[in-house]
Curated annotation (Swiss-Prot):
Gene name per UniProt: sucC
Subunit structure: Heterotetramer of two alpha and two beta subunits.
GO molecular function (one): ATP binding
Record keywords: ATP-binding, Ligase, Magnesium, Metal-binding, Nucleotide-binding, Tricarboxylic acid cycle
Chain's role: Succinyl-CoA synthetase functions in the citric acid cycle (TCA), coupling the hydrolysis of succinyl-CoA to the synthesis of either ATP or GTP and thus represents the only step of substrate-level phosphorylation in the TCA. The beta subunit provides nucleotide specificity of the enzyme and binds the substrate succinate, while the binding sites for coenzyme A and phosphate are found in the alpha subunit.
Coiled coil: none
InterPro entries per the UniProt record, alphabetical: ATP-grasp, ATP-grasp_succ-CoA_synth-type, ATP_grasp_subdomain_1, Succ-CoA_synthase_bsu_CS, SUCC_ACL_C, Succ_CoA_ligase-like_bsu, Succinyl-CoA_synth-like
Name recorded for this polypeptide: Succinate--CoA ligase [ADP-forming] subunit beta
Any one GO CC term of the record: succinate-CoA ligase complex
Positions with a binding annotation for ATP: K46, G53, R54, G55, E99, T102, E107
Keyword flag ATP-binding: yes
Root EC class: ligase
Length: 388
């Protein structure tokens, strides 16, 4: 689950971190009034969506004219913002963040992730602020400095100072940076973050550290113990198919191919997508139906997959462990009949009663292709998607 920038900055403020005064507004009039409440003669107005690249897409504006604030809000509220991180439809803009304008002398980067390789929370800092960290990692990895947090000892001030020295901060800025670092580390643990980014973390003209942006991703598995964070969820930013799948405990991620994939087990699902690619196809989705491939769940999975108009064929790859393959085959047949599937369906079954399962499919009188192996399944579904 992701948070909006205004929500992230609200959490920053709770932990005593330096952020700009700002208000999230639902209407153009509120945006104008917010600028008046903030005061000053320059403001920043930003569309609030769960995507980066807003500035290049026209979703951020610096202005000293309240009429321009009104025009900006009227233009974007209720519309979709398309950036390089969204699909072609973009993300809906329901709020505009109005903030005081901050003078920038230098831009830095500070972020943290749960690193699977080290099995630790890892903080990253760089002098290349305002640039996508992935770009920095690819082009100039030596400019990314890391601090690995020991889960027993916790974050230490010396780690912040070490990063600060590498960023070229002066003694006053080091103290401020240490406060930001320690606050973010505590926030990361308190709220079960999976990702945290401040890009850019700026040094103002007065020489002070300031959090100019905020990006937060929450570990979805921990939301049950984060009631406050759950209330911040904005369902309008979710993919409609992914949200529907979650209601049925299906793990679905939309992709841009034409081969629908339905698999039980995340590892097998990724392997299935790989072999479809290997044989010249493009997966339209990742979909893990989990351990219980029942008729009801398979039917919902078909509905979700086929709601994508790009899908020209579906590959069902099921390993029957606890659930017998003949029962799975009957569930697939029932689901195909219930949903009224019109595209070719290729099914590969392995595991308990696999031969019986394939026999059940063959005797179904439905347009279901029973594959003999995963390679055969991939070849068959790619041909079917191409209309061959």
């Amino acid at each position: 689950m992701n948070l909006h920038e205004y929500q992230a900055k609200s959490l920053f403020a709770e932990y005593g971190l330096p952020v700009s005064e700002g208000f999230a507004c639902d209407t153009a009039q509120e945006a104008v009034e917010a600028a008046g409440h903030i005061g000053g003669d320059m403001w920043v107005v930003k569309c609030q969506v769960h995507a980066g690249g807003r500035g290049k897409a026209g979703g951020v504006k610096v202005t000293g004219d309240k009429n321009e604030i009104r025009a900006f809000a009227e233009h974007w509220l209720g519309k979709n913002l398309v950036t390089y991180q969204t699909d072609e439809k973009g993300q809906p803009v329901a709020k505009i963040l109005v903030e005081s304008c901050t003078d920038i002398a230098n831009e830095l980067y500070l972020g943290a992730v749960v690193d699977r390789a080290s099995r630790r929370v890892v903080f990253m800092a760089s002098t290349e602020g305002g640039v996508e960290i992935e770009t920095v990692a690819e082009e100039t990895p030596e400019l990314i400095h890391k601090a690995i947090i020991d889960p027993l000892a916790g974050p230490q001030p010396y780690q912040a100072r070490d990063l600060g020295f590498k960023l070229g901060l002066n003694p006053t800025q080091l103290k401020q940076f240490t406060k930001v670092f320690m606050g973010l580390a505590k926030m990361f643990e308190d709220h079960d973050f999976a990702l945290l980014e401040i890009n850019p973390l700026v040094i103002t003209d007065e020489g002070n550290i300031h959090c100019l942006d905020g990006k937060i991703g929450i570990d979805g598995n921990a939301l049950y113990r984060q009631p406050k964070i759950r209330e911040m969820h904005d369902p309008s930013q979710d993919d409609a198919r992914e949200a529907h799948a979650a209601k049925f405990e299906l793990n679905y991620v939309a992709l841009d191919g034409n081969v629908g994939c339905m698999v039980n087990g995340a590892g097998l699902a990724m392997g299935t997508m790989d072999i479809v690619n290997l044989h010249g196809g493009k997966p339209a989705n990742f979909l893990d139906v989990g351990g219980g491939a029942t008729k009801e769940r398979v039917a919902e999975a078909f509905k979700i997959i086929l709601s994508d108009d790009n899908v020209k064929a579906v590959l069902v790859n099921i390993f029957g462990g606890i659930v017998r393959c003949d029962m799975i085959a009957e569930g697939i047949i029932g689901a195909v009949k219930e949903v009224g599937v019109t595209v070719p369906v290729v099914v590969r079954l392995e595991g308990t009663n696999a031969d019986l399962g394939r026999e059940v499919l063959a005797n179904s009188d439905l347009d279901i292709i029973a594959a003999t192996s995963l390679t055969d399944a991939a070849e068959q579904v790619v041909k079917a998607a191409e209309g061959k």
